[in-house]
């Protein structure tokens, strides 16, 4: 049963605990991670390539020993391979041991002919692959040249269209088409309120007057007449 609910007859008082004789002194608390952990230097052991040990080693002798061990392992595996090869060769029937009834003109008589035939077939395959590769390269080069030519023709067409459409003297239409309109269009801000305010009153027309009110200005009236009414 818990004793958390029981009353405390002796409550804790400041300055009565351990190390709390002076209340003006701040309490200090340290964590285990704040304490120094590595207080001793670790040295290399005899098998960890210490400098003295490296100086005393004879690397050349160790290398020669490893090479001799590798040669011994290689020679140990060689008799087994030679025995396997000799047994496989001995299994092949000799030409003089084959009866005459089993001989056929289509059957290969020696392994050299088989090797020559395989080499010729390999050469033929290589030549065919090289020819196919050259064909593919040629087709790709032709396709690239065709695309470049089409791109140049398109760029030339666009350039000529820009030249003809940009020059009004060369852009004259025929008799069947409507005549070109060379009239200069007015700007959208020709009739705004605060345009050319720095000019004198004499430069302006007599029938126009300045009104510092956007609702009673001529521009607002024209706008309402044109778009609202």
Swiss-Prot record:
Biased composition (Acidic residues): 104-126
A single Gene Ontology CC term: Prp19 complex
Compositional bias per record (Basic and acidic residues), positions renumbered to this chain: 52-84
Chain positions with Phosphothreonine modification: 47, 110
Modified residue annotations for Phosphoserine: 121
Keyword entries, A-Z: Acetylation, Coiled coil, mRNA processing, mRNA splicing, Nucleus, Phosphoprotein, Spliceosome
The keyword Acetylation is assigned to this record: yes
Database matches in InterPro entries: Cwf_Cwc_15
Region described as Disordered: 1-133
Residue spans of biased composition, Polar residues class: 24-34
Modification N-acetylthreonine, positions: 2
Protein name per Swiss-Prot or TrEMBL: Spliceosome-associated protein CWC15 homolog
Gene name in the database record: Cwc15
